[in-house]
């Protein structure tokens, strides 16, 4: 009885192992596809490059903002092909959250200080806002909170902003 089960299983697995479509030369990755990408450091900490938060512009799906745990804030205008740091001149390097104002997609809210507890954690300097898509930043307070985990702009009132903060770890 077992012989009858083994043969169909063998035929089935043999069939699916050869059923993949062969790649065309035009489908293969070429070095020219990667010309816009360059290797670069994304942070100074032991575990750099940790994405803390991401925000995508609801009015332009190609424009993204990324808050990096130990690497500042990055922006892309081409869906991630290339990235530019947009807060390197600020007094913080650790970020925890980033939010696009639902009333004005050029207004970006940033919570500094990654909201984790570990040897790699970086403290922040409160909340910052940019009125021009990340070109300039203004401190809005809560400097002693050190770790901002979430910012929500009220959908009814752009002047009401809710903030969640862990507070100092030590």
Residue map of PLM features:
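Bacterial Sec-dependent N-terminal signal peptides
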Residues: 1-23
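Beta-propeller blade termini and top-face loops
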Residues: 18-170
């Amino acid at each position: 009885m077992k012989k009858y089960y083994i043969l169909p299983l063998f035929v089935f697995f043999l069939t699916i192992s050869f059923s993949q479509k062969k790649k065309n030369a035009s489908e293969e990755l070429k070095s020219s596809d990667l010309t816009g990408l360059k290797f670069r450091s994304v942070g100074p900490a032991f575990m750099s490059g940790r994405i803390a938060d991401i925000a995508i512009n609801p009015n332009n799906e190609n424009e993204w903002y990324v808050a990096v745990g130990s690497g500042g804030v990055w922006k892309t205008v081409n869906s991630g092909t290339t990235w530019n740091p947009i807060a390197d001149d600020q007094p913080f390097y650790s970020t925890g959250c980033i939010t696009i104002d639902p009333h004005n997609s050029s207004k970006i809210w940033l919570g500094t200080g990654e909201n984790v507890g570990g040897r790699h954690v970086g403290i922040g300097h409160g909340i910052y806002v940019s009125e021009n898509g990340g070109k300039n930043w203004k401190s809005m307070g809560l400097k002693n909170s050190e770790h901002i985990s979430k910012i929500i702009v009220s959908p009814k009132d752009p002047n009401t902003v809710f903030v969640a903060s862990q507070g100092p770890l030590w």
